[in-house]
């Protein structure tokens, strides 16, 4: 069967990385074509290298034949409906499978669901599915989870003499709690480094009341590859702003695979991703965060043990390629 993946697979950003990993996972099961939004992407060296490995063509939507048979998969493209791309996909005769990935709808998405343009909607979690229950009432739905190629995030022992904690997320001020810098600093750790990606002027304005000292490293989006950034951290300390609910937690699982121990808040999907005290820590209040972090800081053998267990849990329970392959074959079958 023919599968048309709409977007730009790569290693920058969650949706692009997911598409790249799905190509590796499914290239033997589907005749894949990548449909890029702009002609310049066809010449992108990284994309060309990925697609040439699997003999996959890249075209623009306007260059596809007027009549096609197969499935179109679009992932987290905020302009997919407002640009008219969804309607154009349908006029060519393709079944449209859509995965939003977020906890909010994009412009034109609700109208497309109501009109019947979407043949199947995918969700990464039950939590996300419940959020969109009204919008997608009557639309066939499937829960896929989120596939991360575990070989891209191999476990690595940390050897930096300076204890480093940090976080990785998109540069949205709402992703950060209002007390973010104080949250880190009041842990009371000595000889520590804080690394944050992604940071922006807009995020910085939210904390203009705080003076960031030399122990802070605030990186713009994609300043480093996600994997290399995570290798630089001992702990993935991830307090989240009160206005945000996580649909899944891709960066948390990437951190686990590398051996970066996650310390995360309750009330999201993280209890589905890790076992508290074994493959990470889920905290209800600041005192719990402080106790967990200080123990991991002071007890290196314990930290190394949890680091190993994080990676093993993520690889076996969350990122098993064959299990995900079966899931996606079902999700894309009509």
Q: Where do the PLM segments sit?
A:
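Conserved catalytic-core segment of nucleotide-activated headgroup transferases in glycan assembly
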Residues: 149-224
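Donor nucleotide-sugar binding/catalytic pocket of nucleotide-sugar-dependent glycosyltransferases
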Residues: 117-154
């Amino acid at each position: 069967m023919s599968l048309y993946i709409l977007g730009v697979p790569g290693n920058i950003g969650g949706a692009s990385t997911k598409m790249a990993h799905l190509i590796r996972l499914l290239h033997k099961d589907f005749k894949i074509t990548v449909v890029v939004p702009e002609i310049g992407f066809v010449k992108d060296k990284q994309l060309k290298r990925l697609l040439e490995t699997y003999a996959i063509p890249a075209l623009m939507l306007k260059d596809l034949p007027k009549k096609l048979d197969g499935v179109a998969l679009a992932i987290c493209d905020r302009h997919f409906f407002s640009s008219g791309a969804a309607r154009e996909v349908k006029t060519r005769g393709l079944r449209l499978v859509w995965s939003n990935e977020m906890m909010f709808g994009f412009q034109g998405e609700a109208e497309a669901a109501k009109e019947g343009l979407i043949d199947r909607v995918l969700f990464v979690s039950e939590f996300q599915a419940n959020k969109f229950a009204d919008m997608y009432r009557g639309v066939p739905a499937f829960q896929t989870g989120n596939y991360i190629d575990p070989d891209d995030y191999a476990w690595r022992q940390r050897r930096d003499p300076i204890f480093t904690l940090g976080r990785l997320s998109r540069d949205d001020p709402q992703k950060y709690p209002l007390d973010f810098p104080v949250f880190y600093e009041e842990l009371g750790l000595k000889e520590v480094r804080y690394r944050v990606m992604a940071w922006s002027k807009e995020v910085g304005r939210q904390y203009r009341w705080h003076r960031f000292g030399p122990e802070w490293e605030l990186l713009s989006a994609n300043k480093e590859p996600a994997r290399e950034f995570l290798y630089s951290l001992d702990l993935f300390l991830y307090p989240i702003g009160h206005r945000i609910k996580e649909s899944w937690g891709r960066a948390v699982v990437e951190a686990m695979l590398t051996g970066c121990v996650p310390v995360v808040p309750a009330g999201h999907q993280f209890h589905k991703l890790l076992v508290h005290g074994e493959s990470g820590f889920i905290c209800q209040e600041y005192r719990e965060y402080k106790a967990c972090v200080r123990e991991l800081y002071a007890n290196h053998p314990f930290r190394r043990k949890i680091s190993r267990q994080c990676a093993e849990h993520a690889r076996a329970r969350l990122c098993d390629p064959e299990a995900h392959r079966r899931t996606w074959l079902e999700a894309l079958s009509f």
